[in-house]
Amino acid sequence: MVCKHFGSCGSCALYNQNYTQQLQLKEQRVSELLSPFYTGELELFDSPDSRYRARAEFRIWHESERCDYAMGNIEKKGAVTIEECPKVIEPIEKRMWKLLEKINASQEVLKQRLFAVEFLATTTDECLVTMLYHRKLDEAWSEEAKMLERELNCRVMGRSRKQKVILSDEFVTETLEIDGKEFTYVQYESGFTQPNPAVNVKMIEWAIWQAKKVGYGDFLESYCGLGNFTLPLSHYFDNVLATEISKRSIHAALQNCELNAVENITFARLASEEMTEALNGVREFSRLKGIDLKSYDFSTVLVDPPRAGLDEGTIELISNIDNIIYISCNPETLARDLETLIKTHTVMEAALFDQFPHTEHVESGVFLQKK
């Protein structure tokens, strides 16, 4: 990927290395962190070099009468205006510059106190644009935004403090082919989604390969989000219990279950710590009413925690389950958690998923089996 803003825009910190070099550095970093626990081959899953990101946020920089997109400066001092962003997927690219033209052509209605624009797009050319303001949005804004929807063939939302204006919908619908099957996902504007669709598919398929090695019992998932892993993996287990703290994500997960005609998943709105308390019989939760936890016989658990990794209670809980699929967005906390998990389990497989090319961020996964 080549970008005229390499060296000034802070979005791509590894701009001075080609993609192969970047991947080698990430492989070295993850391999070193995992070396006390795993001596096998680290499987690498690369990304497209450009046009890979389906979610993006840009600041709006006001200069005289004009607005421009801006990103944080690479030196973390101020911002730099941008004229291109080759990492966003085509459904964003083809709309973002037309949108900027419309904003600048507007008689203040669209540009007044606009401070950021967010894009959420799909590989099937759907796109949701969220415009963020430091002012209350009125009917005049709604009318111009409706014109944007028609002209850009996308969905437009407006947000300001304690205000959300939905003109048509607040979601997009993605369809991905995973392990030879099509899966449809409703993705909401404020919900978490994996930003790199191509690598996301590889990541889910890797988890499926591990699940196929088990081939029995029930499946437990923590941090399930909108069902990204849950739906495809549900085909390889008898019953599934998936937990997530976000109301919006649980709502999306239930919709996605229905869209994909999956009937063996039960979703529960619980934090990871609460899931541990419930399964250990420490606390009862009204949110689990009608769910017989004792009826499950979990053979496999998948965890995909935030950067902080797993809490001690969750580690203790999953250490009692035969097979663990651990997806991590922070290899340092993954290594920390493995120090405990290898007391009961052996790391059988490890993988690196390059969700974030041109940055130092890296996603990884390990598959563990009970000793």
Swiss-Prot record:
Known EC number: 2.1.1.-, 2.1.1.35
A Gene Ontology molecular function term of the record: rRNA binding
Reaction catalysed by this enzyme: uridine(54) in tRNA + S-adenosyl-L-methionine = 5-methyluridine(54) in tRNA + S-adenosyl-L-homocysteine + H(+); uridine(341) in tmRNA + S-adenosyl-L-methionine = 5-methyluridine(341) in tmRNA + S-adenosyl-L-homocysteine + H(+)
GO cellular component term, pick one: cytosol
EC supergroup of this enzyme: transferase
Record carries keyword Methyltransferase: yes
Protein name, as recorded: tRNA/tmRNA (uracil-C(5))-methyltransferase
Species classification: Bacteria, Pseudomonadati, Campylobacterota, Epsilonproteobacteria, Campylobacterales
Gene designation: trmA
